[in-house]
């Protein structure tokens, strides 16, 4: 019997079966997760953490592209985004930090009929303010 073909479409939040029950992180959340794991390993090995080239590059990537640099700012971002969005949309909004609603809708098409421009812009403005005033 032929298997059904799953048509992926991020605009409709059809991300594939492997993503159905998984959480999605912003780059800032992933940065905190990696930092926490590395700190735990440092405590367990008296400060000596063997880092592969991949891990070094991953940490460097997070340091460059994480929009929220501290745990406090990242948690504040989570609070701003709340549960209004699908986990994929939340991760994208928190990672991309779009300047305006039009940009957000272009980059995250699934937002099209979910929230009006005024409310979306308000959320984006809160994220922008948070980025400016993070520690």
Swiss-Prot record:
Family to which the UniProt record says this protein belongs: Belongs to the eukaryotic RPB4 RNA polymerase subunit family.
Single annotated GO MF: nucleotide binding
Physiological role:
DNA-dependent RNA polymerase catalyzes the transcription of DNA into RNA using the four ribonucleoside triphosphates as substrates. Component of RNA polymerase II which synthesizes mRNA precursors and many functional non-coding RNAs. Pol II is the central component of the basal RNA polymerase II transcription machinery. It is composed of mobile elements that move relative to each other. RPB4 is part of a subcomplex with RPB7 that binds to a pocket formed by RPB1, RPB2 and RPB6 at the base of the clamp element.
Report the locations given in the UniProt record: Nucleus
Which processes are annotated in GO (biological process)?
transcription by RNA polymerase II; transcription initiation at RNA polymerase II promoter
User: Where's it mainly located?
Assistant: nucleus
Q: Which SUPFAM superfamilies match?
A: HRDC-like
Tell me which stretches of the chain form a coiled coil.
Answer: none
Q: Which UniProt key words apply to this protein?
A: DNA-directed RNA polymerase, Nucleus, Transcription
Q: Per the record's keyword annotation, is Nucleus included, yes or no?
A: yes
List the GO terms this entry assigns under cellular component, sorted alphabetically.
nucleus; RNA polymerase II, core complex; RNA polymerase II, holoenzyme
Q: Does the keyword Zinc-finger apply?
A: no
Q: What's the protein name? A: DNA-directed RNA polymerase II subunit rpb4
Q: Which InterPro entries match?
A: HRDC-like_sf (IPR010997), RNA_pol_Rpb4/RPC9_core (IPR006590), Rpb4-like (IPR045222), Rpb4/RPC9 (IPR005574), Rpb4/RPC9_sf (IPR038324)
